[in-house]
Amino acid sequence: MPHSVCCIVRAKSSPESDRMPYDKDEHNMKLNWVTNRKTTGINRKHDHIAFVLQGGGALGAYQAGAYEELGSTPYQPDWVVGVSIGAINAALIAGNPPQRRVERLLEFWHLVSSGILLLTDAMPVSPWLKSGGELTEPRSAFNQFSAWQAALMGIPGFYQPRIPPPAFQPDGSPGALSVYDTGPLRATLERLIDFDLINSQQVRLSLGAVNIRTGNSHYFDNLDTKIGPEHVMASGALPPAFPPVTIDGEAYWDGGILSNTPLQHVLDMRKKSRSVLVFQVDLFSARGSIPINFEEVLKRQKDILYSSRTRYTSNMVAEIVNTRKAISSLLAKLPQELLDDAEVRHLAEVTNVAPVDLVHLIYRQGPYELESKDYEFSRVSILERWEAGRRDLRDTLTHPEWLKSAGQTAGATQYDLTQHSRPLRGEGEMPARRPETTVVPSVTP
């Protein structure tokens, strides 16, 4: 939540050196090539490809960069799931035809980073600000200043401060419930997203929110709900910064305050007979060092708070895999007459689940990033995060062997193939630094 105040000069133009790393003609050329070719190198065919996006504010540019790379490969997602900023990215993907998705993502991230001081190669300070390098203190100061500006001035096309502030607004009014007005975001969503396309269900879209009255997680899914901008805004209504969104008489907040990683929704809601390849793009890392100052305490707390659901899910389903193994082993020892029993047949059915392959990308923050990183929208930081997403997804896809583990018959195999991991050592094998190699989804009828 923004909590400090500072003013930085607004930029009036976008120099060539600060444009998003996107070549429309090149992207469309690769997309056409992918559309017209056969994916002959893939041994295992997945029934679904899901793109699962965590919440994380300004860090969401990493997800947009990852999609730019993914969108020019054979792995076009047919199911996009998001929470908070992940819901906005997800709606931009599902709400545009393939050839326009990156263009629309680019427009959104260009817009929300247009109000902060831009850095150009003509500025003498830009080399150390752009690269970070060993000069972390100047870059950290710049990042903090841009976060302060976002807190004071708002973000173009996203949110603006309420005047007067909430303390001076009448109880029960929208202005009394949040620091910022998200009216600009609604206008942005209506301009950049084709909601008729979303509701045609060509791509499944699931958006996570929290019902304020019940405290339960709720997913708006275009398979059973007519999606509009209000559903996207409900998923990103993080209190107390943003106001709740009321839909059909129920008020909703940001899904991230309960579960910031929507992986469990995919595992629960998929048909157990359908295999799925999941690209999960997280913005907060569960792993980190012990803080040595108060700023690091705040940053580490936020990382743990918003990444813990992924670890919880992995630990929970790892326990289920042992139960499945025990059941399968027991069933194999039963005589034929018992195998015909209705209860035994039910056990055999629920333990026979199509595989889930989980490709896990996690944003690795720079040493100069602070606790305010999720509301630090400077153009230079957005560009870096976008490029990091492209790079990590590209590096992941240089290991096609992770799709060729045809021997897997159940459960989910998890791969973390980013630049901080060692290359795969064999088919279906995890890098050594990630000991939790196999997990299994919960089973639903």
Name each model-derived stretch:
Residues 81, 208, 277-281, 357-361:
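Hydrophobic/aromatic beta-strand patches that form the interior of the parallel beta-sheet core
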Residues 33, 44-50, 57-177, 183, ...:
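Patatin-like phospholipase
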Residues 21-49, 210-213:
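Small-residue-rich anion-binding loops in enzyme active sites
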Residues 6-7:
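Cysteine-centered motifs
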